[in-house]
Amino acid sequence: TVCPTGALMDMTSEARGLAAMFTETHSTCNYCSWGCTVKLETKKGEVIRIEGDENYNIGINEGNLCAKGRFGHGIIHNEQRIENPLMNVGGDFQEVSWEEALRTIADRMQTTLNRSGPESLAAIGSEKLTNEENFLLQKLFRDVLGSNEVNNLANIRAPYLNRFMLDCFDNGISSQPITKLQEADVVLVFNSDLPSEYPVGGNSVRFGTVFNNTDILIANPRRVVFESEAKIDVRLTYKHGSDVAVASRLSKIIIDNGLIDVNKAKSSIDNYDELVQSLSSYTAENTEKLTRLPDDVLPRAAESFA
């Protein structure tokens, strides 16, 4: 139930019965890379219900799930789901066994390896896989096949962001748990439709606006809907493709106006002086031409964020 009085019930599942008839499995939702912990209820090998896992005090979703994570399990047993590998035979895809498919892939990889060497093989992981699955993928290519050509879809989509994270935090992940969003004074949502792409993260930010007076800064080429316009402190709707100009202008304003501890910044950022010099071209006039943003909103965003 989602209602303390039981007036609102989840009626999406056709299966009914005593609790003893169901098997519970604790796992991680794989709809996106957020990593919500879930509890699956199954009956005779079929997923009947998925709920947020609150029993073990682990995970970042605190029992919350988005609509896809909670109600999207119907695809698992959908009659149109492809359950076995399909191999292109003469232009037509024919169903084959897993053993045949894996053997074909292994043989072709070995042939390529023998002919052109390990660097001719490459792997692309996914942010929708678990950390363990991505780890095994890179282990296969680096240790077994000898290839270092390993990448991830998340890095392909946002290589500069990942490089920035590596430079700042020595790894490609955030330095704080996602739940800290609801405790922040200011949250800058940059080029992300957080409520739609990562609803549980959007909930954390909304929680902060209600209970912690968190200010939200939205920077996005699209007009992201965030429940209520009143909750957004500053909105930066810039020209598509000018992300770097927006970030650079914000950085320049923060530095020029003395809104940061320069000594701390120099100790944390290699080549700090070169960074400052690289921002010199991002004047108010040039940035407005690149982003189509009036310069009066950028100082407000910079001051709020800093």
Task: Please identify what each model-predicted range represents.
Residues 8, 14-33, 83-306:
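Cofactor-pocket helix-loop regions in the catalytic cores of large enzyme subunits
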Residues 43-83:
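Extended active-site and interfacial segments that coordinate phosphate-rich ligands
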Residues 23-55:
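Catalytic and ligand-binding motifs that coordinate phosphates/metal ions
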